């Protein structure tokens, strides 16, 4: 029988682990978004419809970053459908989960939720059917102060006048 020996030195550091490795994601699967972090009209929710109990737990866990939309939902996600007044957002078939997505929780709500949860934002983009131009347009919407098509769209649709400063996009 061969023997092996290992020495562990708790003071020997090879590098720092990026805190974002401990991040998470949220997607419209089951009750993860609707009823999980967002529930309009519930006594458990704040004035924006965000579940206060969930926000408190996410802050307590110190989740460093959350990707939205996570999982398979991104395969049919059109971020443009998820911005602006909720009553004007189109309802679309969500083919991955076989439901109708009303887009009441979208990009703008996620950005607000992330601020309240004290976590960073990572947006996922649908490169499978939409391509890299979608990522460029999303960055323009989120990060430009104004004077461009998508930044002016943000300024005309919602209360977020300052850019989000979106730094990370996943594909």
What feature does the model see in each segment?
Residues 2-14:
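N-terminal module-boundary/linker segments of secreted carbohydrate-active enzymes
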């Amino acid at each position: 029988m061969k023997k092996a020996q290992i020495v562990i030195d708790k003071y020997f550091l090879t590098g720092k682990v990026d805190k974002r490795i401990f991040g998470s994601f949220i997607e419209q699967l089951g009750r993860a978004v609707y009823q999980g972090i967002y529930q309009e009209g519930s006594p458990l929710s704040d004035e924006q419809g965000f579940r206060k109990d969930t926000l408190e737990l996410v802050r307590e866990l110190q989740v460093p970053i959350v990707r939205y939309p996570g999982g398979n939902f991104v395969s049919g996600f059109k971020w443009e459908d998820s911005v602006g007044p909720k009553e004007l957002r189109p309802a679309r078939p969500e083919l991955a989960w076989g439901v109708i997505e009303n887009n009441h929780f979208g990009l703008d709500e996620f950005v607000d939720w992330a601020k309240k949860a004290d976590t960073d934002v990572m947006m996922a983009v649908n490169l499978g059917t939409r391509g890299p131009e979608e990522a460029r347009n999303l960055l323009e919407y989120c990060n430009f102060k104004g004077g461009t098509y998508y930044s002016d769209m943000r300024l005309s649709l919602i209360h977020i006048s300052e850019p989000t400063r979106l730094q990370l996009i996943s594909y």
